[in-house]
Amino acid sequence: MKKCLFTGVATALATPFNENGVNVDEFKKFIKFQISSGIDALVVCGTTGEASTMTKDEKITAIKCAVETARENTSSKKVPIIVGTGSNNTSTAIEMSILAEKLGADG
């Protein structure tokens, strides 16, 4: 039987932007706030995170930021990062799923 990725509550994160793309500093603050508030998992680049309008580079930036920030978490609880990789193009969805895994996403 497969083990569950997480139990509890996951936040579907909105992705903050500035004139240069993903606002990494604000995104890190938002992720740290979620973790310190006790969230069990984080969803990055889902429909709440504007994934359908993000470029591939913006998605990569958001995924890297989330994975790195969650791994900096000093509590004993690991916060899984789940990435929305859906697309209306099957090959793009597969490519993004493989890329998300390579970048350290959990699901």
Across the structure, where does each feature detected by a protein language model lie?
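Active-site beta->alpha loop and helix N-cap motifs at the rims of alpha/beta catalytic domains
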Residues: 2-11, 15-107
